[in-house]
């Protein structure tokens, strides 16, 4: 199965991000309930591996971590794939990410080697977009690229299963781990 460990932003941040992205008139916007900051992604994980990981995650107590949104950007320059918030790589956030990644590897989970880029995805774009959608994204970034939101604290990590479909991914909460 596909799954990931993430932080779920507090409702007041989700509300602000939802209002922000409503100004973008293209792409497939992420539902409010699906907004998250991925700590580590498991492209193919077994239930046995998740059970092993569960034991370790129940013991992680790093304390709450701040999410500080410092801007809006895209992944993919010539052909943007997604629009996301830029989240400051606070030392507490980076420490938590390294701890959960290490816990996953020690549980036998084979993880892709990716650099941690803290972000919250707001919208996804098709592989090919008409020029007018490129222009809309450009205008949106010009107007909103410096969007900021005061740091908010998150005190739990969530384990989410991701099921792909033609309508995009469906997320199902599997477990919650308090970190405070």
Model-predicted segments: where are they?
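Histidine-dependent nucleotide/RNA phosphoesterase domain, centered on the 2H-phosphoesterase fold
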Residues: 1-180
């Amino acid at each position: 199965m596909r799954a990931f460990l993430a932080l779920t932003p507090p409702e007041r941040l989700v509300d602000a991000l939802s209002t922000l992205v409503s100004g973008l008139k293209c792409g497939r916007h992420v539902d409010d309930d699906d907004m998250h900051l991925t700590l580590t992604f498991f492209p193919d994980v077994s239930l046995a591996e998740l059970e092993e990981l569960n034991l370790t995650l129940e013991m992680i107590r790093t304390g709450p971590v701040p999410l500080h949104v410092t801007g809006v950007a895209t992944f993919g320059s010539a052909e943007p794939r997604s629009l996301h918030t830029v989240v400051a790589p606070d030392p507490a956030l980076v420490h938590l990410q390294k701890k959960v990644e290490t816990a996953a590897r020690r549980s036998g989970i084979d993880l892709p080697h990716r650099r941690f880029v803290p972000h919250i995805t707001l919208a996804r774009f098709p592989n090919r977009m008409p020029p007018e959608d490129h222009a809309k994204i450009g205008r949106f970034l010009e107007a909103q690229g410096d969007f900021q939101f005061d740091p908010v604290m998150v005190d739990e990590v969530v384990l989410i299963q991701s099921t792909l479909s033609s309508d995009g991914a469906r997320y199902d909460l599997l477990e919650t781990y308090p970190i405070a």
